[in-house]
């Protein structure tokens, strides 16, 4: 009988060890970014590096996409749990039938802007009549530009649109176009300034376009009750708050894991993006989303304005 006691103890220890390992094991989540890692993703990187995801039992895999158009589609297909996307894109893709829903906000203001050379001939939007405007993505950017021009008595037919792909700042600097639509105010403006060609920006939200969330977190709409998502948003909020409270330390953490981004452009973009992060990533302004949906319908980008609850939610 006495010789069997150690066996019982060993068995008990093995059981307790197994249970402990299961308790420690992290729930895994895959989040596909909208683009390669950059300062727009700062709260996600900080939440990762400070252990905020780990502290709530999550292992979050942050993946840069091979194709920047693919993240929402991969989520809709069940290939990833979450993706970083854009509010305007969400409305259009839901209208097209993709089963997506917004569960959080990363960047709560527009970053998009209409940019020209500060020392060039464009001083006001009205000066763009008869000029060349570069763009990288059609659809929403065309509609946004049209509204901005109309406010100053110009039709989109009064300008020449040129597809410059993603070479927005270089196209202005080289003189190939007089302005570009779709330039991110935290990047292209800094890129131009660094090479001694400062820009002037016109902001859509000041020129007739309703404000919107530039970057959001989307999930598949039949997965909104996944308990991992609530934990994810809670950890993301901690990442944002740490970033706001400790911007310099956060920058050092960021470049520690992404050494290739330790340059003047990203340092300036970091500074300019911080005030634009959503302090409450999980909060949802339904009226704001409803208003933007109506705007897209007026511009002919969507046919209907479904209830906000169909494509955006505030997790409980």
Describe the predicted segments one by one:
Residues 225-301:
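Secondary-structure end/capping motifs
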Residues 27-165, 169-174, 178-186, 201-202, ...:
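Short, glycine-/small- and polar/acidic-enriched structural segments
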């Amino acid at each position: 009988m006495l010789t069997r006691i150690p066996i019982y103890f060993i068995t008990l220890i093995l059981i307790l060890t197994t249970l402990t390992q299961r308790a420690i094991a992290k729930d895994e989540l895959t989040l596909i970014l909208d683009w390669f890692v950059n300062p727009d993703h700062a709260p996600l990187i900080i939440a990762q590096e400070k252990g905020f995801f780990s502290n709530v039992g999550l292992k979050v895999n942050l993946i840069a996409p091979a194709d920047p158009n693919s993240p929402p589609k991969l989520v809709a297909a069940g290939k990833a749990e979450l993706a970083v996307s854009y509010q305007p894109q969400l409305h259009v893709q839901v209208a097209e039938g993709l089963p997506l829903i917004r569960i959080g906000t990363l960047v709560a203001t527009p970053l998009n802007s209409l940019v020209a050379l500060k020392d060039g001939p464009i001083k006001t939007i009205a000066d763009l009549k008869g000029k060349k405007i570069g763009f990288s993505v059609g659809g929403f950017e065309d509609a946004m530009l049209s509204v901005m021009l109309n406010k100053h008595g110009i039709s989109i037919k009064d300008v020449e649109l040129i597809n410059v792909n993603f070479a927005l700042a270089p196209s202005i600097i080289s003189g190939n176009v007089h302005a570009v639509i779709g330039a991110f105010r935290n990047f292209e403006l800094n890129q131009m300034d660094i090479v001694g060609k400062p820009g002037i920006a016109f902001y859509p939200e000041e020129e007739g376009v309703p404000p919107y969330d530039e970057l959001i977190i989307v999930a598949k709409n039949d997965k909104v009750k996944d308990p991992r998502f609530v934990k994810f948003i809670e950890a993301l909020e901690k990442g944002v708050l740490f970033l706001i409270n400790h911007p310099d330390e956060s920058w050092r953490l960021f470049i520690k894991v992404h050494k290739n981004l330790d340059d003047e452009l990203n340092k300036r973009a970091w500074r300019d993006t911080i005030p634009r992060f959503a302090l409450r990533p999980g909060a949802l302004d339904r009226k704001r989303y409803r208003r933007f949906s109506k705007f897209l319908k007026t511009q002919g980008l969507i046919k209907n304005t479904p209830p906000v609850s169909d494509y955006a939610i505030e997790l409980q």
